[in-house]
Amino acid sequence: MRLILLGAPGAGKGTQAQFICEKFAIPQISTGDMLRAAVKAGTEFGVAAKKIMDAGGLVSDDIIIGLVKDRLTQPDCSKGYLFDGFPRTIPQAQAMKDAGVPIDYVLEIDVPFDAIIDRMGGRRVHPASGRTYHIKYNPPKVEGKDDVTGDALIQRDDDKEETVRKRLQVYDDQTRPLVEYYSSWAAQANAADKVKAPAYRKVSGTGSVEDITTSIFAQLK
């Protein structure tokens, strides 16, 4: 099972990725984790990436693809792998295709943006313990106060509506076009392609966690 998981920030990808990885006994591959591991290990790509990051630059897609190919040779990838947060752009998706990285499914968890803003904007956190509440779905017993200590709850900057809207706009501009990219590839696949076009699947990310998981497993057959 080799798949790419797509979905806007706040769509619940992280939760569902855990269930998918457990069911199919595959690792979740994140480019951030790969970069940190490669830099720590001092690999060829890690050294190159560190130079760029130390200078405040963005690591090139070529280096990321090199890291991906190295990572996929590890024994834990023998049954497959799940990409979460990569590719983010069409050039990255094209680079993966050109490099011959095989993918069986592209799975999109679809949640309306208004629902994501409601989900994330309502979060409140107790900083000392990490306890999380939601003003609508999981409110504290006393408004604005932690149930255990009575301390004031905060709204993280990442959860403020303005920040959430900006992140959703970036997703809409950069990552949502991947849906069309993969759909078109599947429809126009040709013999010259190094790898077979992945099947595109879309599930609704609204509803209970269990229902969403059931829908996902029904699509991944």
UniProtKB/Swiss-Prot annotation:
Subcellular compartments: Cytoplasm
GO-annotated biological processes: AMP salvage
Entry similarity comment: Belongs to the adenylate kinase family.
Domain of life: Bacteria
CC annotations in GO: cytoplasm
Gene Ontology molecular-function annotations: adenylate kinase activity; ATP binding
Subunit structure, interactors included: Monomer.
Binding-site positions, AMP: T31, R36, G57, L58, V59, G85, F86, P87, R88, Q92, R156, R167
Annotated spans, NMP: 30-59
Keywords linked to the UniProt accession: ATP-binding, Cytoplasm, Kinase, Nucleotide biosynthesis, Nucleotide-binding, Transferase
PANTHER family according to UniProt: NUCLEOTIDE KINASE
Reaction catalysis annotation: AMP + ATP = 2 ADP
Purpose: Catalyzes the reversible transfer of the terminal phosphate group between ATP and AMP. Plays an important role in cellular energy homeostasis and in adenine nucleotide metabolism.
Gene3D superfamilies referenced in this protein's UniProt entry, alphabetically: P-loop containing nucleotide triphosphate hydrolases
Broadest EC class assigned to this enzyme: transferase
Presence of keyword Iron-sulfur: no
Region feature (LID): 122-159
Domain comment as written in the entry: Consists of three domains, a large central CORE domain and two small peripheral domains, NMPbind and LID, which undergo movements during catalysis. The LID domain closes over the site of phosphoryl transfer upon ATP binding. Assembling and dissambling the active center during each catalytic cycle provides an effective means to prevent ATP hydrolysis.
Pathway as given in its UniProt record: Purine metabolism; AMP biosynthesis via salvage pathway; AMP from ADP: step 1/1
Binding site for ATP: G10, A11, G12, K13, G14, T15, R123, T132, Y133, G207
Entry EC no(s): 2.7.4.3
Protein name: Adenylate kinase
Listed Pfam families: ADK (PF00406), ADK_lid (PF05191)
